[in-house]
Structures are given as C-alpha cells and as structure tokens.
Amino acid sequence: MASYESVIGTLEAELTGVADVFRGLAPEQWQRPTLLVPVDPGLPRWTVLELAGHFDISIGLTRMLIAGREDAQPARDRTSFFINPRSETGPVVYAYAYTMVEGKTSADMPGVLAETFTKTIAEARAVPASLVGPGYFAPMRVDEFAASRIVEAVVHGIDLAQALDVPYFATPDGIAMTAAILDDLLARRTTGRRPQELSADMDWILAASGRAESSDNRLPLIG
C-alpha cells in the first residue's frame, strides 16, 4: 500500500489539475450542466458551479477531520467510506452543493477552491497518518480519508471534463489508486472481479462510478 506521503502527493496532483481547469473557465462555462442525475430525477442537474461547490466541501472534509482529532477507533477505511445507500446520502450531497455556492459567483470559486485545496494538503502533511477524526459517516484515520479524497477528485474530475466536453485529466497515479479502491469495493459488496472488457483502469472507473454504461448488473458501485 502506498505511503501516506505518496497518498498526499497523489491527492495534491489531482487537486492541482482540478483547480487549473476551474481557473481557466469562461463565465458561460460555469453554467454548463453536468451529466449527473439526482436521486430525484425531477430535480435540475448540477451545473459546473454546483460541482465546484461539491469539490469545496468534499475535499474540505479532510480539514474537518484533522481539526476534530479524537481518541477513537477507526470505523471506516478508504473503501468502506463508499458503502452507503445513495437514496439517503444523495439528496443531502445534492442540496449541500447549492448551499456551498450560495452568495458566490463564478469569479469567486477558483479562489475558494484554491484556498481549500492548498490548506487541505498543508494540514494533512502536518499530522501523522494515524490521526483519527470524524470521517463524515464514522471515525477514520486521516491517511484512509485522504485516499478516499483521491477517488472524489478523480471521479468528479470526470464529471467536470464531461460537462465541458474536454479530455479527462486525472493523473496516472490517481487513476491507479481510484481503480484499486473500486476493485476492493466490488470485492466487498458482491462477488468476482471487474469484467475483462474493463481491464483498462479508466474504463473501469467510468463504469464503476456510473459515468459510462455497462452491461454488468453489479455496476455502478458508487453514484
């Protein structure tokens, strides 16, 4: 398993790529709809602006974990973080993205994200891998939570690329770690391995996250 410093380095590289894309957007691109379908399909899809709001909170949760350091046994890891009913978590996540961007404009968000991403990496580097804090659902070690943020960055980076109709920009290390976590998630939730036709890691990530169609009835694993 990758070292904590390696995990942080991979997360930093992913977040740098995400921040660079957001920083380069024209005003009208912030209003482009994502392809994400809410749990309630009657609701509007996030635009790129709401996706930025989700990035802010999902990555910023790392800082909350560190600030909430506690003497507790970890109850989840980088894989089990993603074992939860979408019907329950999806509406909360959907609504909170709107809360995060309330009162903000597209001109504000690149700076907001840059600050959140920079502080997240700096604070993660300043604490030991074994630190335990609130991991949203349950206590988690910071190294495990940081690894789960790589999945968030890669998968939602795909959402950003799809909304903008640009090539995917995840790093090889980020893709490899995300694919490995999704492999482990498949093993924990069902039986067997990923389909042979999804042997390429990016193809696997797209199908396992529901960002591409798949004939495998075990998929998607995450929403």
Question: Residue ranges of each PLM-predicted region?
Answer:
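Short amphipathic alpha-helical segments enriched in leucine
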Residues: 19-26, 52, 56
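Oxyanion-binding "anion nests"
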Residues: 113-117
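Conserved alpha-helical segments that form or flank metal/cofactor-binding pockets of metalloenzymes
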Residues: 48-94
